[in-house]
Amino acid sequence: MISFNPVVARPHSFSAKPICSAFHTTGATAATTRRRFSPTSANVSAKQIVEHVVLVRVKTEVEHSKINDMVNNLYNLSSLPQVLHLTTGPVLRTQSPTLSFTHLLHSRYESTSDLEEYNTHPLHLSAVKNFLFPVIDDIMVADWIADDFAGSVEVGPGSIIRVKLLKLKEGLSENERTEIVDVTKRLKQKISMIDQLTVGENIVQARTKGFSIASIGVFGGLGAVHALDAQSAALNDQKDGVRGFVDDIVVVDYAVPANTLIK
């Protein structure tokens, strides 16, 4: 059985590359979020979006002002025209037997080409090189396509985002990988407090640490998350459906704040 005791990994050094998308080898005392208001960011049904999640661990010795600069500069990326939604800041908790993260960035795009343009934009490259990489010692990235996305692309203040990443055993068949995705998707039908759920295979080519299945659950607040955790039967059904295929799991909870910059 996989336990969830966070451990501290060894520090890493990072080259000045964009945080990777499917095409690249590639928070703070408060958190920030911003959404682009347009017809495409309203409620939608049965459409495709691209999820982008970056998890980082800030070095323990970093000054708070530099952490704030990191979060603010990542937040400013929400002004880019490709971004439908972006939120970033410190995580509530990380559950993992092997990894520990302090900050999260979550954003959404209409297509992989939009994500590609975001990743190669000079504002993004500058934020990563000058404000992100100098203050962190670990990073993991997950991008995936949600083909059956429904609801709002915006995740409102007060919501809780739960990111779950799975590292699969080697040698699994395509049918087995598909079953893992389908088992996770079925959670939305079984558990009413999940407002939104997307899941898919990680299309990133680097900085994945071998985690190839990613999902995001959106909840109305901490009360909904606590209610989910109390529903052991439904959760155990999901765990039983994937346990034999999984080597490692990372679960990160994050509270979406109001869209204010850190000072």
Q: Can you say where each PLM-predicted feature lies in the sequence?
A:
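A short mixed-secondary-structure module that forms the rim of ligand-binding clefts
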Residues: 120-128
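Short S/T/G/P-rich N-terminal loop/turn motif that feeds into the first structured element of a domain
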Residues: 2-106, 110-120, 134-236, 240-263
